[in-house]
Amino acid sequence: AGFVGANTVDFNDYSQIIATRNFVEGGTNVYQGSSHGFSVLSTMAADKNGVFVGTAPFAKYVLVKTEKELSETPEEMYNWIAGAEYADSIGADIINSSLGYSEFDDPNDNYTVDDLDGRTSIISLGAVAAARTGMLVVTSAGNAGGGAWNKLTMPADADSVLTVGSVNQFGIVSGFSSRGYTTDGRIKPNVCARGEGAYVYRPDGTITPANGTSFSSPIIAGAAACLWESSPSATAQDVIKALEVSSSHYYTKNERIGYGIPNMKFARFYLSSNPGNEISVYPNPFPDHLIFFLPDDNTTDISLELRDMYGRIVASEVITGRRYQFRWVPGEYIAAGTYFLKITRGSKIQVTQVFKI
């Protein structure tokens, strides 16, 4: 709704804002109205040594205002689409969207929870279109949790969009964080990050805690920018998959936390070591267990054989069930040294050298 403070507060030692656009009042002045956008921006772009560092302080930023401060009308959703088109036209890689819609000043314009299918609201359709250009669209899940609506707010229901819910400092889902699923049964939110007690810059230059998925979303967007930079040949959908697969609740996903809180170290390994149909193995060297990342939703049994330098099988197992990721403990009595891991999945055989420490 505005970026008041972003042009006056010394929150970044570098000049990272390269363009601005105002689709509400017109022109390029976005430093008016509300400071919400500045607080959102600070979670990514802040870089004051010894004070506060955001998740992507060296990224370049374009500030786009699409939200009216004092009203809630469908016009704002069209503003959002215009903003997304503008972002695409200037070559933006990632959109962070810290807003959501469900009800409006005129009740005749309201949506219902049955409309949360990603194909009904104009803003969700716009978000899908933006994602199909190759941009990574990251959006807040909404702050309707526990209320009469309780569910996601649009465009958080959009397919191919990374929807982010909120947790507190202990990893517990925030009461206000909007719940999934979508009406067609898709997992939303995709992931979560801290949006309860998240530290942000204020327009007076102070740093204080704030609540909202408006802040968990950019925290993930900034982290995703760094992740993508580490594997520039990946696609936006590859980045989303890496974040999901690496998350804390991948095997117990639900409508509150989605796939969970991403482990960026695992996500980076998955993204950088998972070309084509190859199965990734981590860590290497390994202490007592190995983690396997699959490039697709596997439904085929996987045969594992760990052989020593003499070709002797020291551990083996057949893994069954549908999964993208699994953990294997070869055995507690395996000596430190070099081994060859044979992975058989259907007609495909992969041999990887691993080191036990």
Language-model region placement:
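C-terminal subdomain of the subtilisin-like protease fold in secreted/lumenal serine endopeptidases
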Residues: 92-96, 229-284, 314
